[in-house]
């Protein structure tokens, strides 16, 4: 077997616009929320910051109590958007394992005065790049007592 490399192939970097992402995600969210308005499982859907902004602003999300965003591409900036969302203020369970969260992002989050997720009972952050000190800082924060 031989492999030939070379050539002048050109590849386009196609990144959909925010509006296109919002439209596509709304088409996914609508039937899921109609089926179960209190629980939403979006694990492994390549959700990153733009998609989190759509989720944060999508009014039907107000009824969701349990949100599974595990195994996605959620970073520290997206984490801020989730926790500062008025629409997601009723969340009781948030699953964020296997994402791109860091200890620094968690430390910045606990310092925020804009946190709206006051009803959280379950927060899963396993398999992220979190430090022991950032977890301790979160546990001692008034936001998470």
Language model region names:
Residues 1-145:
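Leucine-rich tandem repeat or coiled-coil scaffolds
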């Amino acid at each position: 077997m031989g492999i030939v490399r070379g050539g002048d192939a050109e590849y386009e970097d196609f990144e959909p616009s925010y509006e296109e992402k919002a439209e596509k995600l709304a088409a996914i969210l609508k039937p899921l929320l109609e089926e179960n308005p209190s629980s939403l499982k979006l694990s492994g859907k390549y959700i990153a910051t733009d998609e989190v902004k759509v989720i944060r602003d999508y009014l039907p999300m107000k009824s969701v109590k349990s949100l599974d965003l595990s195994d996605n591409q959620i970073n520290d900036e997206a984490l801020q958007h989730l926790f500062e969302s008025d629409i997601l203020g009723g969340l009781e369970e948030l699953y964020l394992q296997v994402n791109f969260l860091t200890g620094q992002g968690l430390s910045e989050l606990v310092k925020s005065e804009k946190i709206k997720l006051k009803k959280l009972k379950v927060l899963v952050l396993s398999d992220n790049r979190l430090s022991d000190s950032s977890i301790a800082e979160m546990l001692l924060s008034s936001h998470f007592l």
